[in-house]
């Protein structure tokens, strides 16, 4: 029993450390096709919210829409960046920019993770997944899935890292 418990702890300890790490050194692209190193979102020293989503994910679209509706109010109360990372692959990534523009989501930074490198590095298994990084780049909050009202929980977490 003791040996089994020690084995489980030994397996989980490295994952605990990984959960607290910041952003990996990975290149994604912006909607214009320009290379973008994800670590550069931390350059201003403000908290960053990263939302992983894709175009055919209904909860993802609901979440982004709900956040878009309150984003300007949030910006009045807190200093942070919001980055939406599309995990659409090469077959569907061409739909991202028209969707973003059509929905009027102009206040966020939208990035494309076509090869899934960032998604894998951040251990994102399903979408939507929201990750909040504090000013130092430490992951302080993660939420998987979306139901109406989750955006308020996210904002409470954003306020904690101001």
Model-derived features with residue positions:
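Positively charged n-region of N-terminal signal peptides that target proteins for export
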Residues: 1-4
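A short beta-strand-turn-helix
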Residues: 27-47
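Thiol-/selenol-based redox modules, centered on thioredoxin-like
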Residues: 132-162
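Short, internal strand/loop/helix patches
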Residues: 99-133
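Aromatic-flanked redox-active Cys/Sec active sites in thiol-based oxidoreductases
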Residues: 51-57
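N-terminal signal peptide c-region/cleavage motif recognized by signal peptidases
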Residues: 14-16
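Boundary of Sec targeting at the N-terminus
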Residues: 19-21, 34
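Structural microenvironment flanking redox-active thiols in thiol-disulfide oxidoreductases
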Residues: 62-103, 115-120
């Amino acid at each position: 029993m003791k040996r089994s418990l020690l084995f489980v702890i030994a397996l989980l300890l490295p994952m605990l450390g990984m959960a607290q790490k910041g952003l990996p050194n990975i290149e994604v692209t912006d909607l214009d096709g320009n290379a973008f190193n994800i670590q550069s979102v931390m350059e201003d020293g403000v908290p960053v919210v990263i939302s992983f989503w894709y175009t055919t994910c209904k909860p993802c679209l609901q979440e982004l829409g709900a956040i878009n509706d309150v984003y300007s109010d949030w910006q009045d109360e807190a200093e942070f960046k919001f980055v939406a990372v599309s995990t659409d692959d090469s077959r569907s990534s061409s739909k991202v920019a028209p969707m973003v523009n059509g929905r009027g989501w102009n206040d966020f930074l939208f990035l494309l993770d076509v090869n899934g490198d960032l998604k894998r590095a951040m251990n994102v298994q399903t979408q939507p997944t929201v990750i909040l990084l504090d000013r130092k780049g430490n992951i302080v909050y993660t939420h998987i899935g979306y139901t109406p009202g989750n955006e308020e929980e996210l904002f409470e977490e954003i306020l904690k890292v101001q």
